[in-house]
């Protein structure tokens, strides 16, 4: 089909000035085809002018740049000429470089863990070795052996350091666990001591002599006797178990020297005397071990805190070793024993008056007997009234029981333990509360950023805002139902508040006022000047 005139004109108008070549066209494929022979291509053949011309046949002719002409650049300078080469040689160089890079990466991966723990001196040595190897052009076998030996040494050092760190962490963890166990044991002992305080107080009420015990048994019932026997068995069992525990403990820590005798004592039934004897022997063996342990740990604590270095605080009581402090406290044993014999609760044992009157208590002499022996002259002064009699006291006895050698009362020591325990509980509670307060404060700060839940319709008095007042604790309103004021008293009270006086004879005032008015009217009539029919 022939083209119309308009199509022919448009083809001529659109036709480009320079001829366009399609690289995918088979006719023009020879222009863009590279013929390689023996590893050499046509691109590397600069002598073939025909190929150059064919390749540049579709280029436009452009004049030289003015800038290039001004600067006078000479592109034909021999320094800009390249070196002849082939693709095969290029590929061989690339493959060699890739192999070297892979080997270096493998070696770096092997030595990465070891080289991470190098010191500065080792890094400098390695850098010097690398520079020498680069200068030589390759690594020798000796350098590889040295590097291998160095990596082994570094690995060994890292393993030792890791083992030391793990051992120190385990040691610290075991110390912390042992400290927690010690504090738990100490708290349990204090709790047990506090629970036994009631039993210690009740034991002071028991009879003091065998005669009073026999007399009490005669008055007791069968149930009471049975309970006494059961308590005696439990008491002996408890003491035997305590002594066996102490023997095992001292054998385990090598405190007891004679192990065979100690093992023989484990399976032995003891009487009351034997219990006291073995308790004393165990205490004497434990004393040396206790002083050594206290001295050891007190010196460690003082050296860690740095108090030992200060000469001014060296001789203070609180900075002395723990064993010395214990010995100082126990040195005045008579004073400590006297404090335990103070009868702070005014407890009187059963049949105490009778035992004292019959002279069964040699450590305690009745003031009645003492006055009769010493003061024969004052026999008429009333021997039944003791010297320590105080009429202001409700519980006056015939005997001075403020200091009783047959009573054991360590309430002052018990109160110290109780106060320490309470302070510890309070401090723990405060710590937990402070942690909770910090958590709540952080939550409050985070909540401040959020939109608050506010009732927008509660403004301008449309809703009444109120809060319920808590009831007053331990408050009771006065009850006035038993006695009430009369109306006259109420009027007089309020009139007195206002500074006035109230006359309660209201009828008499009215009569007097009427009488005065009548008298005034009579006088007015008498003094009138108007006369009728005068």
Curated annotation (Swiss-Prot):
The keyword Coiled coil applies. It comes from the Eukaryota. InterPro entries: AATF, AATF/Bfr2, AATF_C. Its main location: nucleus. Induction: Up-regulated during cold stress and following nutrient replenishment by dilution of cells fron exhausted to fresh minimal medium. GO terms for biological process: maturation of SSU-rRNA from tricistronic rRNA transcript (SSU-rRNA, 5.8S rRNA, LSU-rRNA); protein transport; rRNA processing; vesicle-mediated transport. Residues 52-77 have a biased composition (Basic and acidic residues). The keyword RNA-binding does not apply. The modification Phosphoserine is found at residues 41, 44, 366, 372, 379. Present with 15400 molecules/cell in log phase SD medium. Involved in endoplasmic reticulum to Golgi transport. Involved in a protein-transport step blocked by brefeldin A, which disrupts the Golgi apparatus and its incoming protein flux. May also be involved for mass growth or cell proliferation. Belongs to the AATF family. This is Protein BFR2. It comes from Saccharomyces cerevisiae (strain ATCC 204508 / S288c). The gene is BFR2.
